[in-house]
């Protein structure tokens, strides 16, 4: 430009040139200073940039200001641009506005930005092509003409020519570049040379650059503030562009709503969001906005600033932009000084930045407009960009990267270097890692510590051997930041997915990625210890697509000693993109397939860990868990989303296809061969505890929750004594490959556990350790607070609980076929239900057999290992609840059946008593014989106070006469007895034999009215009062049993018992043989021996050869297969006695005896627990084959007993009489209903032998033996009605505890009354039994002999008749004395005699008839050899075989048996011979008193059939004899005589038997019609044929 032109013209020319640049189209020439010359300078002040034409995708430029712009030009072509105070304000466009914009691409945004700065006409056309809009061409001054036109005539300007040519060229070919088709002219060539010269010597200096990016259109919206203090750009040889910048920072400004006056609000909004219309090249372009952007900041923003990123120095260089047509860039080099990133601030503002900036800038949008990739500008940009892409990037070097974790905690990465070359690709290295402000060290053995190589076909990442020392606090801080970063990444990916952006493509098959990490050691200092995690090597190869950790070691070090270790073997993480398929089981043990993309497999875990280390590590993990975010699962899923494949779809040819359910999982973790050993228990007995799992499968199901499959779990404890005890063990049962335990944690936090084929052990010895730990915690003042349990459900199938006692060695197994334990809702209610269960018992757990063979059921496994099944139960339900700090347990059992022998019953009782820790104390803790504080009793007594000389007789008389005062004191004392809990028991036990008022005169003594049972009534009131005010109850247990059956078997379950009994028998036989040889013993002398305190074996010399067979028959019954050389002591086939009980109710209250109390209460009593049991009804049945009686014990129905009252009530209470001492006492209260007893001598022998069995192996021996002191025993009056039938009149009871005299009498309805007793101060139960026998025995022998003799069978009827005769005479004399009329007196007394004695006469007649029948049957049996076979019933009560009576009768008729038809009428009763049964056994004899007719009519009918039957039998016998005689005619006469002799007794005696039976049935019918209650008593007493 000519410098001689006027200043105004120079400004106009400069304005014209600047207006070709869109940004400077609004330049005010009044603020332009021009200095022309060899070094020309153009200075602009307060330049308001025209930002209306600046287009940035997703953004709107609101304002642009330059405080000062200086343009320097030299003659040599140097160009120097200097700018100061550069401010831009950009607003992110809202989502709605953004959706209306054109589709985004990097080429379009770059082109829009450059074209908005430089008004190139052809590029404007290209812009229209890209955007698809026909925007108008840039504004050209109206008075502008082409300077080259001649004559000043207006001609077509150069731009128009270019546009036309371009348009025509673009229509010729789509593949040709529009730039190449533009015709060049000399002016264009000159223009390009000038620009190239300027670009070659271009220098740019910018200071105080500020870009504010508003994240919304609201006035108080948040924003990003980008500040650069200084930017210097220079050009060196070879078109190398060098940029130097410092003071770079990016901050987030959180704006609060500002208070702007209403008058300025509109102005502020206009300045904030828009600018004035564009100025023309005339004077209108000189208009001023009159508002400064800085004043805008001060008035609008009241902000809080967060520094996100800062760079103190940056050097950037590249080669390129050599001309306006060459924008190619290559050899980029970047050097950074210190790069500081504040992670907490970034995470805090992540949502604003991501939502409003990142995705609005780079998110793709679908549009129907022209595809930008096909535009010529995009093609030219791609050609320039990729013309030399191998040399595009050269080097990135960063001195330090400061990653701020908090205000004073930073991670420093030093010497970060990123290089790129054609041969090796891209190499990244980190020299060192330092941690500032953290209790953490990063130590690397080599430099650099991190290397990464990114080649064309191979990527390698290496980390040197590293040791990381980090504190627990800092590690938690890192975890929190890590979780926030991962949350941030998930957030970005979720938004990325919503916007439809495709994911990064996977590696190609020819690409290889490998990761190699050397030894990695992480040390976490804890309190006086170090937790060390050592990973020797980490490798990853993209070919194998898995990440391998060959070994992971975790060690807990205390004082340089390794006390715990954990080793993970061969950890493999499958990272392949292929979906993995595995077989899994759900909570119902149903098999299905699971698919996932991520799978982790660990081949083994081996751990030796100390319990203290476990607590420490558990505390650390708990802190990590608290620091980790809670994983939330979606509450509901879309109906269209498919979580698994339904297995209910119909498939063709399903017989050839198995359709299994399938689900999706986020990841799967599979662990094999897990072994964990825990040691260091506080308990003195436990050495260590071992856990082992054969396999563990863990998976995280999508939208469902966590699932664990556990295979072959085994937990055991080893004691210092050497014994090894199991806790949990899988049985050798079930389908191979199925898990034994399944744990499900659902999305709604519910837990479900399924258990199958598992045995859980209860060891009473463990309670000792638990109680010791609890007592230690209590001494330390540590109160354990248990958190509320979540909702859960536990399902148990074919699993068992094994109960092992404390001191003895038997084992009780309760097998549950199905049990469900649930807790629902927020309440503390836990429910348990079980349908069927079984009981198994063994006498020696250590001697069980180990079976390796797979059994079909767990029952088979238990039986083969040595257990005996002793019972089962049905319908178990329990509820557990906690209210007001009291644990309430309610249980109900529908039915329970126990089948036990004497030895197994004794074992079961002893085992149940030993399922707790024995609580015994030495005497110094139970009693306090010496007071803790010495008391001087004579300290307050005057020595001469009670001398006779000092006593006044008047005072004595006066004091003696004041009886009322002393009486009031005593009464007040007695009234206060109610306030004490147990003192009434002591007071009631005191008996006063005399009083101290003997000196009173007889006139002063008032009559005393005695009230019986006054103290008992007072005690009842006190007990009710104490029960209503029970305190310190910690648990209440209520358990009901609807029906209970206890079957008592003869024989023995344990091999040990059978062996000892067999040895005793052998020793007895050997002793008899030796005595016979020495002739020291006669044949009639009885030899005996006793085993287990109850089994008495006695024999004589004549029975020596049959001793074993006799004992076997007593136990098993008569069997043909019994061998006399061997004794059979196994449990009998059928039970010998049955105890039936209904409605058993148990109530247990447990009190807190350890709760802190004041010293004033230490001398008071304290309850420990109270047990209340009641049985509504119970019976004892007699099932001996030789006994004809039915019920051994039943309710005496003739005595009045309320139906609402239980037959048996038992109350037991244990307490401490003095709370500060450990001595315990008990009270017992028993109440029983009147009982009816039918005692057969064999039955009595069996019950005594059964319940007196005592095995010394199961004696419970305590460290400090203690006999329970019974403070009080109370029972009510019990009325008994006894029938007794002896079977052996001379041998007596082998135990010797009952006199032989009782076996001489048969008792029938003997009345015995056991009077109610109240005993105090009893030492143990042995003394209690002795006292009861003494009290009741003396009372019975002294006062009730006559009642017993009334039941003596031979004279009972005569006694009854004598009593009737006595009544007759008494009434006769009384009536005669009153009326003096002999006839009337005889008539009245006769009527009374008949009423009272008729029943006895009939009963006596029936007994005589029955006795005659029995005598005739015995006679027939002796003569014919078939004793009572016609009224015997085989022992089939317990056989499972059902007899077909029709076929039996048909066969019997063909064979002319014992049940003949008479006049084509079936017999009323069926006679079954024991010999005809397949299962032979001792026949069960049916009494002639059973099956009595109900009335006279029924009696006559049965009498007729009985007479008819026996006559028919006699006829059949005679007919059979006649047939035999005809067949034996050819034989001798002797044979015929023998045949007639055998048949004669039957033919003669059988009609007589029929006659006596008919008379008995008739009389029984008459008596039963008179006394209706007799039938019920007969049914209770005698067995029926259908029993």
Curated annotation (Swiss-Prot):
Membrane topology type: Peripheral membrane protein
GO cellular component: endoplasmic reticulum membrane; extrinsic component of phagophore assembly site membrane; phagophore; protein-containing complex
GO BP terms in the entry: autophagosome assembly; autophagy of mitochondrion; cytoplasm to vacuole targeting by the Cvt pathway; glycophagy; pexophagy; piecemeal microautophagy of the nucleus; reticulophagy
Compositionally biased residues, Polar residues: 145-159
Catalytic activity: a 1,2-diacyl-sn-glycero-3-phosphocholine(in) = a 1,2-diacyl-sn-glycero-3-phosphocholine(out); a 1,2-diacyl-sn-glycero-3-phospho-L-serine(in) = a 1,2-diacyl-sn-glycero-3-phospho-L-serine(out); a 1,2-diacyl-sn-glycero-3-phosphoethanolamine(in) = a 1,2-diacyl-sn-glycero-3-phosphoethanolamine(out)
Keyword list, A-Z: Autophagy, Endoplasmic reticulum, Lipid transport, Membrane, Protein transport, Transport
Protein's UniProt keywords contain Membrane: yes
Bridged cysteine pairs (disulfide): none
Source superkingdom: Eukaryota
Region (Disordered): 128-160
Role noted for this protein: Lipid transfer protein required for autophagosome completion and peroxisome degradation. Tethers the edge of the isolation membrane (IM) to the endoplasmic reticulum (ER) and mediates direct lipid transfer from ER to IM for IM expansion. ATG2 binds to the ER exit site (ERES), which is the membrane source for autophagosome formation, using basic residues in its N-terminal region (NR) and to the expanding edge of the IM through its C-terminal region. The latter binding is assisted by an ATG18-PtdIns3P interaction.
Family: Belongs to the ATG2 family.
Protein name as annotated: Autophagy-related protein 2
Organism: Candida glabrata (strain ATCC 2001 / BCRC 20586 / JCM 3761 / NBRC 0622 / NRRL Y-65 / CBS 138) (Yeast)
